[in-house]
């Protein structure tokens, strides 16, 4: 019995120090829940689910006009991580966003949303605590569509967000 208990304790302690999973919140231009899975020392997958509040729309002539969107999206990203110093890292990657968007000044218009984005930022893992803090910038391009792609709106979609995640 003691050997089995020792093996279980060793297995749990190794798993506790691996900390390949992170779950937390993002606040800023993008607000929501965030999950990050460290695949290996260079790559990670981060998926965020939440709401955003800004975008720039372009009309058919390519002229920019300001639009204020409230959107609800899921945003999976593939990231390259680079450790800069102990517990400080930079990341760069890309992803897609899928969801719904609504113009704040026209509440009866709800659009489907599909887009691609880049993602760049910095992160910090707090020593002796299972906590990761990050700051990221996500410029992107998205299309808003209404009723079977009858109406397409192109937007420059960008978000700046601060994240805090529990590492496990």
Regions found by a protein language model. Give the residues of each.
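Sec/Tat signal peptide C-region and signal peptidase I cleavage site
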Residues: 4, 14-20
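Repetitive helical segments and hydrophobic/amphipathic motifs
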Residues: 10-11
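Solvent-exposed loop/turn segments connecting transmembrane beta-strands
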Residues: 20-34, 52, 69, 86, ...
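Gram-negative (and chloroplast) outer-membrane scaffold detector with strong preference
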Residues: 37-137
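Conserved SAM/SAH cofactor-binding pocket of Class I
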Residues: 139-143
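Outer-membrane beta-barrel "beta-signal"
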Residues: 155-168
């Amino acid at each position: 019995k003691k050997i089995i208990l020792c093996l279980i304790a060793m297995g749990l302690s190794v798993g506790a120090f691996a900390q390949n999973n992170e779950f937390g919140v993002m606040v800023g231009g993008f607000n929501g829940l965030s999950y990050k899975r460290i695949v290996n020392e260079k790559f990670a997958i981060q998926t965020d689910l939440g709401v955003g509040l800004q975008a720039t729309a372009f009309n058919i002539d390519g002229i920019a006009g300001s639009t204020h969107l409230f959107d609800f999206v899921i945003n999976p990203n593939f990231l390259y991580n680079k450790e800069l110093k102990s517990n400080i890292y930079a990341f760069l990657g890309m992803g897609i966003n899928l969801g719904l968007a609504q113009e704040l000044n026209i509440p009866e218009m709800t659009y489907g949303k599909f887009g691609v984005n880049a993602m760049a930022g910095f992160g910090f893992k707090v020593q002796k605590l299972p906590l990761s803090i990050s700051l990221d910038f996500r410029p992107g391009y998205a299309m808003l569509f209404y009723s079977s792609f009858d109406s397409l709106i192109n937007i420059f979609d960008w978000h700046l967000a601060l994240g805090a995640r529990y590492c496990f």
